[in-house]
Amino acid sequence: MSGSDVQLVQSLTRGLAVIRAFSGARPRQTLAQVAEATGLPRATVRRFLHTLVAEGYASSDGTVFWLTPKTLELGFSYLSSLGLPAIAQPHLDGLSRKLNESSSLTVLDGSDVVYVARAAANRIMSVNITIGTRFPAYATSMGRVLLADLPSAQLDAYLADTALEPITPETVTSEDALKQLLIDVQRQGYCIVDQELELGLRSVACPVRGDDGKVVAAVNVSAHAGAVGHREVVDKLLPPLQATASAIERDLQTTTLKETS
């Protein structure tokens, strides 16, 4: 590889780091904040941000920058090839209508969960969740479902690379406590997270498995903690959620069989 090739690869890596600096928790940032989040020089970040603005992938008011919906184009090819969001969407829509609560599907990407399908009912979170929204896996019900299926070596690597920071006063930040919770998820087949990602938000998630039995995604239902108690989550939200996950799995398996036949 020539020196120019190395430079091009590094340039792409830095540009992607700038894009990843924006998230559902940090949708609008100044140049200084992006530089701090990425560890890149301010001059480098400035060039990338202005390039993103010029190409329509970001906007700015002169001080603050934010990504535009055009960035979704970067992931559409992957999502289309994945097929899973299209399969899951009608099931999420039906579940959301039945429960009058929001339902989502996520996959694990690095240390985050990424939303790939969603049926929104009442807005509970202060952050507007859309396709492509990312949250730290350790603090979400879907994230813990996905983490619970990782081989031990991969889980250890995740924990070594991830700072378990308190997002709310309820967030579990102990590695040992998180590991025990993941064992519980494996045993019971679902996960409830109570106000760890945002105060007032309670959610329950269960896995979506491929035909090989491995977890390929997680599906959840979220509700306002003041309106839906823990017992009600188990008794009223979990059974239809599990039925939805099973329906997605059946459709996913059918689609896979058609593609291979």
Question: Where are the regions a protein language model picked out?
Answer:
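Amphipathic alpha-helical effector-binding/dimerization core
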Residues: 64-162
